[in-house]
Amino acid sequence: MSAASFLNIFSIVSGCFPVIAALYNYKHLDKILKIAAAFFLVSFLVDLGLFFSMQLVERNNYPVLHFFVLISIMFFVAIYYYAFFKTTLKKTIVVLGLIAILISIFNLVFVEGIWEYPSISNTILNVLLIFFSLAYFYQLLNKQEFIHIEKQGLFWINAGVLFYYAINIFLFMLFKQLLNTHKEVYMINYITNIIANILFTVGLLCKPQPQKTI
């Protein structure tokens, strides 16, 4: 088995880590972490389904990726909507999410098409989540009261989001070119996915700390 194949399989398996953590710590999860846990379950099932479909059928699975991008946008809009305190930020999250969904649907229908890899939609998702995660860190670090950020479950999940999407943004943008010339570069995605899933797992094992509106 090649290193790329091993990392691919381990990357997929690592997707069950946050799911198991959520089941183990479910009674301690607040609304935000439950939404995040639901997304991780969907993400794991999609990755698992894509892997087996490629192994057994070897058919074009890009339509699934297009719809998964849309699902990801909706989940993360919900997560960050509840994570932010200020009404203006909540409204901004919703507006940007709707714009991202409309662009992704337009791309799916008129630009790249449903049978091509969603580079544009994935790039939009990456930019959106990098902005959301940086804004959340800004809110977290500018609270007026003292908090242990390492005990905040969403801190770890947000760190995983920023880590994964900030590193992979250029990989998703250039996926079509890299697919034919530098397939080994995609191992970056496998490694970052494993690390992100570990961060998500840590976050879901945290007991939510009380948060005060500022």
Region spans (language model):
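Terminal, non-globular segments
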Residues: M1-I214
